[in-house]
């Protein structure tokens, strides 16, 4: 969130889409601290969207929520019109899930954890499909696993993205 808000100072983002919004904390924070005209968020889970909507209302933040598996149910008029896409998708490699702390693996929905064999399945889909939804010069922002930076950088380069930066978050 901090990186997006920092970048918004120079890029003047007006529209942003959060993919896999969960409880809605990312778009709510962006709505509270940023200067966005349009904030959209999607999740595959109706239950998560219910919590996200409730949280947005409690915080008086306008967000358009959609039940969607990535981009599948988004309004067509968004194509080519988004300034930025943000996502904290499932990024844990399938083989590592059993090693997670009990309070994580036993209470988080599996589809919120499992990022496929190498943890990059959702990134691949967003990177590939995101280009048609972003404006020219649009931005992708991701939360990633501590050891996925170089693999994601290569993936982004393969799809022609530039100005790629990997930063450590507050947790390191």
Over which residues does each language-model region extend?
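Class I S-adenosylmethionine-dependent transferase superfamily signal
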Residues: 30, 104, 126-130
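Mobile active-site "lid"/loop adjacent to the S-adenosyl-L-methionine
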Residues: 91-121
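Conserved SAM/SAH cofactor-binding pocket of Class I
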Residues: 1-99
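Conserved functional loop/turn residues at catalytic and ligand-binding sites
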Residues: 20, 43, 81, 108, ...
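Conserved Class I SAM-dependent methyltransferase catalytic core
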Residues: 117-172
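Structural signal for short hydrophobic segments within the conserved structured cores
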Residues: 64-66, 111, 165
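Short glycine- and Lys/Arg-enriched binding-loop motifs that mark or flank ligand-binding interfaces
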Residues: 2, 16-20, 112-115, 134, ...
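Alpha-helix initiation/capping motif
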Residues: 41, 75, 112-119, 145
């Amino acid at each position: 969130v901090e990186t997006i808000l920092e970048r918004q100072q120079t890029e003047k983002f007006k529209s942003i889409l959060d993919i896999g919004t969960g409880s809605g904390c990312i778009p709510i924070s962006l709505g509270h601290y940023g200067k966005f005209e349009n904030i959209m968020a999607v999740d595959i889970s109706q239950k998560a969207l219910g919590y996200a909507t409730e949280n947005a209302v409690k915080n008086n933040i306008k967000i358009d929520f959609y039940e969607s598996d990535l981009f599948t149910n988004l309004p067509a008029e968004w194509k080519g019109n988004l300034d930025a896409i943000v996502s904290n998708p499932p990024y844990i490699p399938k083989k590592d899930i059993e090693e997670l702390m009990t309070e994580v693996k036993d209470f988080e929905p599996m589809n919120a954890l499992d990022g496929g064999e190498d943890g990059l399945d959702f990134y691949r889909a967003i990177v590939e499909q995101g280009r048609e939804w972003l404006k020219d010069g649009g931005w992708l922002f991701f939360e990633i696993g501590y050891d996925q930076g170089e693999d994601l950088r290569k993936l982004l380069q393969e799809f022609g993205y530039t100005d790629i930066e990997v930063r450590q978050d507050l947790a390191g």
